[in-house]
Amino acid sequence: MDGKVGNTATGCPVIHGGMTSAETSNTAWWPNALNLDILHQHDTKTNPMGKDFNYREEVKKLDFVAFKKDLHALMTDSQAWWPADWGHYGGLMIRMSWHAAGSYRVADGRGGAGTGNQRFAPLNSWPDNVNLDKARRLLWPIKKKYGNKISWADLIVLAGTIAYESMGLKTFGFGFGREDIWHPEKDVYWGSEQEWLGAKRYDDKDRQSLETPLAAVQMGLIYVNPEGVNGQPDPLRTAQDVRVTFGRMAMNDEETVALTAGGHTVGKCHGNGNAKFLGPEPEAADIEDQGLGWINKTTRGIGRNTVSSGIEGAWTTHPTQWDNGYFYLLLNYDWELKKSPAGAWQWEPIHIKEEDKPVDVEDPAIRHNPIMTDADMAIKMDPVYRKIAERFYKDPDYFAEVFARAWFKLTHRDMGPKTRYIGPDVPKEDLIWQDPVPSGNRAYDIAAAKAKIAASNLTIGEMVSTAWDSARTFRGSDKRGGANGARIRLKPQKDWEGNEPQRLTKVLRILEGIAADTGASVADVIVLAGNVGIEKAAKAAGFDIIVPFAPGRGDATDDMTDAESFDVLEPLHDGYRNWLKKAYDVRPEELMLDRTQLMGLTAHEMTVLVGGLRVLGTNHNNTQHGVFTDRVGVLTNDFFVNLTDMANVWIPSKDNLYEIRDRKAGNIKWTATRVDLVFGSNSILRSYAEVYAQDDNKGKFIQDFVAAWTKVMNADRFDLA
């Protein structure tokens, strides 16, 4: 339908259903308006499980032994509608798991396998995910059998892990607990391209200019182009892409080689046919195809005639067993460029022994050349990667250990701390990339700690700002950051410009002393100080309140912290404290929206927090923009009252700053940023601002502010769930 009149195959016009078209949406009419949709995704209206369903409790009821046994059996239970290569689905399942987890990028923590997002657009229809819809359909009988006790997200990841076990690898472990989403994610920026595989993400030859936060080199790819840079083979240039891409997934060179080699030790590429015979991707497929895409309705299109990437062949001699054959073939043979039957570039060995060739997927009497992609040849030709590969070749046990750990990291990187892992196979070892935090003391005298904080010389602004800065690093995307651990006192956070190091040092010196005197953790005292500041500010406004507090945060140490990995959590902007590190191409209000989504806040929570923080005097470096009150430090609704007062007029000043003048007298009353003004400009945000500006909602404002504040402070308290 085009939004006006639909026309079915029978030609019968209808006038209903127009609002299902994106062409008539508000964003189509006003594309530059602030779109708050990313704050309201994944709510209960789209979730069929009901508000009382708790997957993390339900999965604990799973018969883990029987479930894994069924997964093992599935690997060799070939189905005629989509037969298994060599009678084993391992390669297909690993590719599915890999491409789910591999969409993770460290810059914003988005992507990854933690939500089952591969079931939805755009991932379910990416060119790099051709035929992974078949893998998920093969899993459906198991999902159907175990029902609510297993999420699609967990099942998709575990299928790859079980596949490796089935083929002989001793895996490192597995943690259940990934919760499904029920519609496409709106917050993930996959790139600006309007066409698949568009080569627009780099502007230089050294391949270092990939736009942040992206990790894949082209739209629709998980990693790099397997044929070469922009489809042109050049292993050393591809090596640059590989290093950047895997680095943006938080993988070092050794992990990169291990994952590439381990992923290509089993399974095969599919390109024995003509891609033009493939039908449309799942999102564009005919209704009778029932969500399956890339269906070949012209030729056979399955088994040995399958077309996926277009490259054709296996990497190793024995593609259904874990061994060291990848390095044997890669390092011991010379390779030359060839074209696959589908027309894709691939590398094939020169003068290979017949016994080193893998057999045909259907007829073991037939053997074919193995293949390597340009990324594989990058491992051979890049000097750093080559050295690692040679060590793995000489020490298969070491390779297996490094790969098992790297696979575990790949498939668990976006799950957050180890406390979120569920099940009998969770490794006991703490890993530094899990950002470990020790358990904290819960038995100290909270009232005594609050009394000492209140008696200190810290201002309300200092206490609230420090607590906010400690907690605001939390990312709901990969569950990193937050106040637990008090890493704000460690490198690199203690030196971040956004944390005002001079002010932070002064405040921490006092709070660390209070922690030592009371037996509380510094992490707890930082949050408690913010609460004390809010309680004092509310009391000054005439409201006696107690801000909820849950003790038990621990204090991380430098030894528990990979300082470099925390660089990506540095705030470069914070609309809540009215701060930008520098001018950006993206509008300040959009930057605030992105941070709000990562913190897991809604639009009205964002609204009430900004209004409250402004009057508490928490602006970065004590700037006065947006401080629409003459009672700084008192928790009033003055920000909203003055924002919505038509006695004021807003005049552009300079550099995205504005003057608030008296409409009659013309005198300047306050200054503001775009972040301040958007709460009066955007129709949705203004509706919230008007609620908090009402005379009868002063108490509601404080109540809602405290609730949103507590949500931020406890966002990383997975031990409370």
Curated annotation (Swiss-Prot):
Q: What residues make up the catalytic site?
A: H99 (proton acceptor)
Question: What role does this protein play?
Answer: Bifunctional enzyme with both catalase and broad-spectrum peroxidase activity.
Q: Where is this site: Transition state stabilizer?
A: R95
Keyword line: Heme, Hydrogen peroxide, Iron, Metal-binding, Oxidoreductase, Peroxidase
Q: What is its EC number?
A: 1.11.1.21
The UniProt entry's GO CC annotations, sorted and at most eight, read: cytosol
- Which enzyme type, at the first EC level? oxidoreductase
Chain residues that bind heme b: H264
Q: Tell me where the cross-link Tryptophyl-tyrosyl-methioninium (Tyr-Met) (with W-98) is found.
A: Y223-M249
Protein name in UniProt: Catalase-peroxidase 1
Name the gene behind this protein.
katG1
Q: Which domain of life is it from?
A: Bacteria
Q: How does it assemble?
A: Homodimer or homotetramer.
Q: What is catalyzed by this enzyme?
A: H2O2 + AH2 = A + 2 H2O; 2 H2O2 = O2 + 2 H2O
Q: Which organism is it from?
A: Legionella pneumophila (strain Paris)
Q: Which family does it belong to?
A: Belongs to the peroxidase family. Peroxidase/catalase subfamily.
PTM section of the record:
Formation of the three residue Trp-Tyr-Met cross-link is important for the catalase, but not the peroxidase activity of the enzyme.
A GO BP entry: hydrogen peroxide catabolic process
The cross-link Tryptophyl-tyrosyl-methioninium (Trp-Tyr) (with M-249): at which residues?
W98-Y223
